[in-house]
Amino acid sequence: MVSAISIVAIFALEGFVTTYSDGTKDLVFVQTLWRHGDRSPTKTFKTDPFQEDAWQFGGGGWGQLSPAGMKQHLNLGKMLRNRYVTNYNFLPNKYNAKQIYVRSTDVNRTIISAMSNLLGQYGQNDNSSTPGLDYPDVDGWPAGYVPIAVHTVDDDTDHLGNMESTCPFKDQVWELAKTSDEVKSFVNSADVQAVLGNLTNYCGQPVDIDNLWIITNALYIEQIYYNATLRTKNNWFTDAFYAKADAINDQVQLFQNGIFKTVPNIVNGHDVGVLTRKVRGGPILNDMVMHINLKLMCQGQTTPNCTWINNLKNYIYSAHDTTIYAFFSALLIEEYAVKPSGGYPLYSAAVLLELYIDSVDKKPYFKMVYHEQDGSGFKDVTMGIQGCPQNSSYCDLDILRNFANTIKPDQPIDQWCLTDLNKSSSFATVSMLFIAAILAINNNFLGLF
């Protein structure tokens, strides 16, 4: 149980502002990263009886959010409102555009998940909003519904939210990782080869570790919507065989996120584990830490470039299972937070990264909370992060900063993605030698004065 919880109210220039305190810890900023809700498959295999025309909900077609997915995020939105508005009195009772910012990847299912979630937070007919002021007071407009902007960027260049964004460097790192002894030993094992071989025969196309996820994901969703028909039309499908294929895919997903038993996993002079975590989870982890640093730096500052972050209380990312898992992998808590090992976060999973300031020692702390799926609550995962205390929900912010620095992309991610792996290595080596030489020369010159 949380002890010594109090709600402290203060007055600011723009009206009544509230803050939540847990003992001496004052909540000042929240960042939320969630996965979209239930959806149709994004693609499937050649012999699958359930092709794109089998999926009619959500506008129809591949990768669309279902009514169940919309409901999952409506529920999560209500939970977030209950936490941050009702219980913590941290976010405003009525939507405030300066305090909440939402960024989604540029696909329907994440954008509509964000809309559904915000409907749960600020779109209910609960007298928290005013007709004619917050929404049109006309027939046909849902009572209480306040539309909230959801921002996005081009999906191909969204290196924060979309782990499949165009990034040749990331592809090169994965191809190199596949040549490591650990991955080759796994792929060439008799059990893995047997499953991949059987799926190749069943699916009418070559199946390997790169496209296995398409099959396991399609079958997962088809068990929800077409379970009986699936087993009749695909008579090779059994629960036991699916479990084997899914377990193989879980291990592949660990590899794809830079998680190896061999540490460091060096291939041709490159640590493929670190490089993978840098190029996948590094950007979003560093984006979150950048927001935190700005929030702290701008405290007490009234300059125009601080106005946005000073007002902001909640920054939201609406994204994917791959995004959350890459984020957790960057912090090396993927297996602590998500079960089973290698399994991706479920529909409407969410990470809450909360920033606190201690009113006594004046130091910043963070707390990380995880929502596993619809129907589950919020669980503290802070203690799973290496270096964080095992007897507290709060961790020194420098621990998070150190992880971010360690896993920060070597260049701005847009540039790094277009860098050749081998050339960047050579360039980095030459650059380090050049810098070392300059420092040596400087030291010699300094010795003359």
UniProtKB/Swiss-Prot annotation:
Cystines in this chain: none
Superkingdom, natural source: Eukaryota
Membrane-crossing segments per the record: 429-449
Membrane topology: Single-pass membrane protein; Lipid-anchor; GPI-anchor
Listed Pfam families: His_Phos_2
Record field: pH dependence: Optimum pH is 3.5 with alpha-naphthyl phosphate as substrate.
Range of residues in the leader sequence: 1-19
Modification(s) after translation: The N-terminus is blocked.
Parts of the chain on the Extracellular side: 20-428
Impact after mutating D181N: Maternal effect lethal and loss of phosphatase activity
Deletion consequences: RNAi-mediated knockdown results in a maternal effect phenotype whereby the majority of F1 progeny of the RNAi-treated animals survive to adulthood, however 80-100% of F2 embryos arrest during embryogenesis.
Places the protein is found: Membrane
Catalytic activities: a phosphate monoester + H2O = an alcohol + phosphate
Known role: Acid phosphatase required for normal growth and development. Specifically required for normal gut differentiation.
One Gene Ontology cellular component: side of membrane
Assembly information from the UniProt record: Homodimer.
Annotated organism of origin: Caenorhabditis elegans
Descriptive protein name: Intestinal acid phosphatase
Assigned keywords, A-Z: Glycoprotein, GPI-anchor, Hydrolase, Lipoprotein, Membrane, Signal, Transmembrane, Transmembrane helix
